[in-house]
Amino acid sequence: EAYSFIYKAFHKGYQTWSRYMSFAEWWNFENLRSEDYLEEEFNGKKLMSIAEQAYIAYSKKLLEGEMSDPFRQQRVVDKEKIELFLPKLDTIIEDHPKYQYPPYFKAKLLLAIGSEENVLSAFLPFARQKANNFWVWELMAEIFSEDPEIQFACYCKGLSLNTPEEYLVNLRLKFAGILRGRSMYNEAKTEINNIIATKNNKGWDLGIKISNWMEQDWYKNAEEYSNNQDLYLEHTIKAENILYNDLPEEIVAVEFVDRNRKTINFVENQHKYGKFKYSNFLKNP
């Protein structure tokens, strides 16, 4: 118990503590007690177990990397440390499937060491759970960096979700660059102006890239749309299909078609039934 108390005390400042990784390695996660793997409760709210917090914090520090030059300007990830840590992360994912975030960080770590072939299978179970979060699709776009069409669809899916605008600035910025590269200048200007409005509202600096784009002829001559929702909807189904590509196909019976709500009720057996929106799949079912 005292050992766990020591870890909790030092864990609180891990984000700004440059020696956190050394401390965690000295402390050794194998010293976590069985109680440390259980959720805690504070003021009526459930809290992530200290074990899950520990693995996430260490993953974040691995992804941050370590200073590689005397001027402390560049960071590099330690691939050897990541490779040593991944089996431990696999164990906690397997032993504690209810932990939501370790699969996400496993995918990030695999990307960091260039192990793309294993990333998708590691990430999909988490992505299916968190599919309504924009950052899931931002990472999915990173996973499919070698497939421009799927990457494009992932950005569309991420931006189609109901999310506070201040969280979407970086995603919109990446997407605007892709749109510009495809000569989709009207759509790119729409994304850029959305970013500008958000940054102005928050009192944030526009940044060099936005400022440079605003001075270029393509931006000045482009037409701004009210939004890019039609573009998003045109491509989201391609992104959504990724989530289920590794699952076996099943045959079901259609019970009812609600043309007003554009939903289909289906049933396979007395234990498996449900409904889904068909507008992205079918025009006239």
Give the label of every model feature segment.
Residues 81-84, 118, 150-153, 187-190:
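Alpha-helical positions within canonical tetratricopeptide repeat
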